[in-house]
Design a protein with these regions (language model features):
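Rhodanese-like catalytic fold shared by cysteine-dependent sulfurtransferases
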Residues: 1-21, 25-144, 148-280, 284-387, ...
Length: 512
């Protein structure tokens, strides 16, 4: 069943607790211009993939929202067609929410970012500004700078001399990387909250060093007149750290303090088979570890990103979350923060690496896919008069695409005369889109296969232009103009989130 719900009723549902997912049917770029605090992007263009990942239980109460364009009704109808039984649409969408006097938030990953700011206020995380860091570097005193972002962000720009250690790895790796207590540890990100969360993770774990967050990250560094390094790949040593036992002691204390429960694989399977509750199964290790082998059914969600971009993986408030890694260190640290962020019931799998595993990425089953005819990169390169439609993220299309390709969002592909070949980072998405274009084929292996074949790639930072990037909420560095002003606005936005959250009243950070 699908029904309309008023803003007042939805507000009451949020306050009441229990399982609830609020899915916004717009593209991320549109979503970022104004949305509900607990809303999670589930754009129509990727609904078959996102809905199955975000809603593992079909009896969960779901409210679909949009900006008043009618997308929410389409998403709700799709969910109903899949068998979801408690689906609603917010009457009037986000505009009606605002008209009712409730807070509308801009930006993305808002609960996670607001939580990071709360952590700094609550725990008194020490920070230093860029000139202070430069003075510390110049002093010659023992110092290590750790960049807590994923490697793809680190490569683009980082603080000179820093080493990439994503947030979920920090407490696990720190004993090997900084074995003495005299070295000052500085954690940075691009802005504020991942620096704060990384530094505070080390402090909560009981690391005895002086630990500080770089205030305003790489943005603040460049705004202060310093230059970032680009193209660096420095990172932590691979494999299990020698100090893993110490890391486990530290993580156990933090996890226990925050109510993280440890269970066996058999118990995890029982929870996952319980149809009365929504249960997420997430593996918080690094991507290469996950790909090499993981528990069947567990999605990859690197720990630091799971805490700071939670809505990529978790949509249901009141759900259970099961985390896995090799020795529970990363799971316990991640789980403790998830408990404080959203009060989810968190479990950690003991001896997760023992027993059956599968390799490769997690992929949802999408039975409605009708496989299209495929074409290899070499064959496509030899053809004439073919239009390639690329469904990659707009910022990825800018960085590299097949010459002459047209960038588009599924569902908004312009009418094209003649032969069409669709490519997308996800093959399922490519086949879904091709089925909506008469006669369209799919590029086998996507642009990655094109590059692997040694074929030419075009790059153009202006295409698509900023205003056309509806699929991606542009970060300051993604923009083609006004970058410095955008950085200042972003940093101010993060700082003010704590106050906006207080005004909204729909969150309760801390111990649950």
């Amino acid at each position: 069943m699908m029904s309309l719900v008023t803003a007042a009723d939805l507000k009451a549902w949020i306050s009441r607790g229990g399982e609830l997912a609020i899915l916004d049917a717009r593209e991320e770029g549109e979503f970022g211009h104004g949305h509900l605090f607990w809303a999670v992007p589930c754009p129509l263009s990727k609904k078959e993939l996102r809905a199955r990942a975000l809603l593992p239980r079909k009896a969960t109460r779901v409210v679909c929202v949009d900006g008043g364009e009618g997308h929410a009704q389409k998403l709700a109808a799709y969910l109903t067609s899949l068998g979801h039984s408690d689906v609603h649409v917010l009457k009037g969408g986000t505009p009606a929410w605002k008209e009712a006097g409730y807070t509308v938030f801009t930006g993305v990953h808002v609960p996670s970012k607001a939580f990071g700011e709360w952590v700094e206020h609550h725990y008194g995380t020490e920070s230093l500004d860029p000139p202070e860091l430069q003075a510390l570097v110049d002093s010659g005193k023992p110092l290590v700078i750790l960049d807590s972002r994923p490697m793809d962000e680190y490569v683009k720009m980082t603080i000179p001399g820093s080493v990439n250690v994503p947030g979920g790895e920090l407490a696990y790796r720190i004993g090997d990387m900084v074995p003495d207590a005299e070295t000052t540890i500085v954690v940075n990100c691009a802005g504020r909250t991942r620096s704060i969360m990384g530094a505070e993770s080390l402090r909560r774990a009981g690391v005895p060093n002086r630990i500080v967050a770089l205030r305003n990250g790489t943005m603040g560094w460049e705004l202060a007149g310093f230059t970032c390094e680009r193209g660096q790949t420095r990172t932590y040593p691979a494999g299990t750290p020698k100090s893993a036992d110490l890391a486990l002691q530290r993580a156990t204390a933090f996890g226990d303090e925050n109510g993280v429960k440890v269970i066996s694989r058999a118990a995890a399977e029982e929870l996952l088979s319980d149809e009365s509750r929504t249960t997420y199964a997430l593996d918080v290790r690094a991507a290469d570890e996950y790909a090499a082998g993981h528990i069947p059914g567990f999605r990859h969600a690197p720990g630091g990103q799971l805490v700071q971009a939670t809505d990529q993986w978790i949509a249901v408030r009141g759900a259970r979350v099961i985390l896995a890694d090799d020795d529970t260190v990363r799971s316990r640290m991640t789980g403790a923060w998830l408990r404080q962020l959203g009060g989810w019931e968190v479990y950690v799998v003991q001896e997760a690496s023992k027993g059956a595993t599968v390799s490769g990425p997690w992929k949802p089953q999408v039975p409605e896919v009708k496989p299209a005819t495929t074409v290899t990169a070499q064959a496509l390169a030899a053809e004439k008069g073919v239009t390639v439609v690329d469904l990659a993220r707009s910022i990825d299309f800018r960085a590299g695409h097949i010459p002459g390709a047209v960038w588009a969002v599924r569902g908004r592909i312009p009418k094209i005369e003649g032969a069409v070949v669709v490519t997308a980072p996800d093959a399922t998405l490519a086949h879904l889109a091709a089925a909506e274009i008469p006669g369209a084929r799919v590029l086998e292996g996507g642009v990655a296969a094109w590059k692997a074949a040694g074929l030419p790639v075009a790059a153009d930072r202006q295409t698509p232009p900023d205003e056309a990037c509806v699929d991606w909420y542009l970060r300051p560095y993604d923009r083609n103009s006004g970058i410095e002003e955008a950085m200042k606005e972003y940093l101010s936005w993060e700082i003010d989130l704590v106050h906006e959250v207080e005004r909204d009243g729909d969150s309760r950070f801390g111990a649950w």
